[in-house]
């Protein structure tokens, strides 16, 4: 079968092999601990083939980031369709949990995502934000639709709440782990319960409001 491959098929096969190797390395060790030699050595890829397609680890890291954003966006779009009939608090929780469900299924992409969003290499920050733009637009559109249904405090503008929920969404996994004392949830059901507790406080606050006189 390999001998009968066209040149295009061989190129696609080589690129896929390199991508899978890079994803495994970046998705296990993060950006800083990975280099081209490590990827080649750990996965039996010749340096000649590697450098024929990619000139440095930044290209490979950005490829992993781009694919992660693309696959996460497709996953979120697919599951978002089921949230339209929910009340706003439940929809916010389930929207946040869509992403966590994706990362439970794809733990290597979870570390790539966290490396890109929480610990981005400074020289790649602008490119990462550009790659994230379609995902961010999807988040904004959904959050803005939710906010239209929310009885907001009179001192809050919708754009402020959009930025707030976007910020919470990007940090939500770390918030869950921290809230649980640094220990990840044992299963998805436990994570859902924790998410519900956290979002109750995020959305409704922790201070008892004084009764009107």
Where are these regions (language model features)?
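Short, basic, alpha-helical segments at the C-terminal edge of helix-turn-helix-like DNA-binding modules
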Residues: 66-72
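N-terminal intrinsically disordered/low-complexity leader segments
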Residues: 1-13, 210-213
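Helix-turn-helix
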Residues: 13, 17, 21, 25-59, ...
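Helical hydrophobic small-molecule/effector-binding pocket
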Residues: 93-115, 140-141, 166-177, 204, ...
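Short secondary-structure transition hinges
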Residues: 100-140, 151, 159-160, 186-189
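Short coil/turn segments at alpha/beta junctions that flank glycine-rich nucleotide-binding fingerprints
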Residues: 28-32, 106, 149
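Hydrophobic/aromatic-rich alpha-helical bundle segments in the mid-to-C-terminal region
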Residues: 114, 125, 147-199, 209-213
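Hydrophobic alpha-helical connector segments
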Residues: 63, 78-106, 158-165, 192-195
């Amino acid at each position: 079968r390999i001998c009968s491959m066209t040149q295009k098929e061989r190129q696609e096969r080589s690129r896929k092999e390199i991508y899978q190797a890079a994803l495994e390395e970046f998705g296990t060790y993060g950006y800083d601990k990975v280099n081209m030699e490590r990827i080649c050595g750990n996965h039996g890829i010749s340096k000649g083939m590697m450098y024929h397609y990619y000139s440095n680890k930044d290209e490979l890291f950005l490829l992993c980031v781009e694919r992660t954003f693309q696959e996460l966006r497709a996953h979120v779009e697919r599951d978002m369709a089921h949230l339209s009939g929910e009340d706003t608090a439940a929809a916010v929780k389930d929207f946040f949990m869509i992403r966590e469900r994706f990362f439970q299924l794809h733990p290597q992409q979870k570390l790539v995502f966290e490396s890109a969003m929480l610990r981005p290499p400074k020289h790649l920050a602008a490119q990462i934000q550009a790659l994230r733009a379609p995902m961010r637009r999807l988040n904004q559109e959904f959050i803005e639709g939710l906010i239209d249904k929310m009885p907001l405090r009179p001192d809050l503008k919708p754009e402020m709440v959009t930025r707030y929920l976007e910020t919470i969404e990007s940090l939500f996994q770390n918030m869950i782990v921290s809230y649980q004392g640094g220990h990840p949830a044992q299963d998805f059901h436990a994570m859902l319960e924790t998410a519900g507790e956290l979002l109750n406080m995020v959305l409704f606050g922790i201070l008892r409001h004084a009764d009107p006189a």
